[in-house]
Amino acid sequence: KSGEVLIQVKGAGINNTDINTRLGWYSKKITGETNTVEIESENGSWNGIPISFPRIQGGDVCGNIIQVGEGVDSTRVGERILVRSMQNSPASKNSWAMQTIGSEFDGGFAQFCVAKSNESFPVNCDWSDIELASIPISYSTAEGMLCRADIQKEKILITGASGGVGSAAIQLAKLRGATIIAQCSPDKASALKELGADHTVNRYDDLIQVLGMNSVDAVVD
C-alpha cells in the first residue's frame, strides 16, 4: 500500500510481548490481582481494540526492504532495516494511542512482512540479523524508563535484571554513567556484571535488609 514497504525478514526476536499478547495480558480487564488465564478477553491488544485474526506475531523485526509502495523512495529497496515495534495508531485520534507490530497488524514470524516506510529505520553496522532483532522491544522499553526517570549518574536498582528489558537497562544505564545494582538469581550474577552491573543482589533476599533504607536514587522495575 501507499507509504509501506515489503520486508524480507532476516531475524525476528521472541519475547514476553508475543507471549503476553497470546494470553490477553494487555487487556484492560487484567489487573494486578487478576489471574490472566481465568479471564476470557476479547480486547487483549495494546490499544484495547480486539485483535483480528488470522494474525502473525513477531514484534522484533530485522530484514531487508525488497519492494516499496506508492510514495516511497525506490532507493530504499535493498536497505537493511529495523522496524519500530510500537507505532502511532491510525484507529485513534489521540496522538499517544499506539499499535504494535505482531499484535494489531502482522509481524515478523514469517518470511516477509509489511511495515510503514516511516517506521522502518536503516541500520548500518556489523551486528548479525539475530543480534539486531533482539533490540526493538526490550531496548526501547528500557530506554523509555531511563528517559522518564532522567537517569544519569545516579545509583539505581534494576529488578528482573537478567531478562531482556533488564539486561538492556543495565547497558543503557551504564552508558549514562549510573552505578547499577542488579537483582537476579545467583547463577546469573557474573553474566550481568559482564554487561555492566556494578553490584548484584540475590532476587530472593530482603532488599531493605541487604541494601538498607534510601540506598538507591531510583528503581528500574
Per-range role (PLM):
Residues 17-23, 91-92:
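Cytochrome P450 core scaffold surrounding the K-helix E-X-X-R motif
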Residues 110, 153, 197, 215-217:
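Local beta-strand N-terminus motif with an aromatic residue
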Residues 82, 219-220:
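N-terminal Rossmann-like NAD(P) cofactor-binding module of classical short-chain dehydrogenase/reductase
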Residues 204-216:
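Short amphipathic alpha-helix with an adjacent loop that forms part of the alpha/beta core around
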Residues 44-54, 83-160:
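NAD(P)H dinucleotide-binding glycine-rich loop of Rossmann-like/cofactor-binding domains
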Residues 127-205:
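Mid-domain Rossmann-like dinucleotide-binding core that forms the NAD(H)/NADP(H) cofactor-binding site
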Residues 1-12, 26-87:
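Glycine-rich beta-strand-centered segment in the early N-terminal region that forms part
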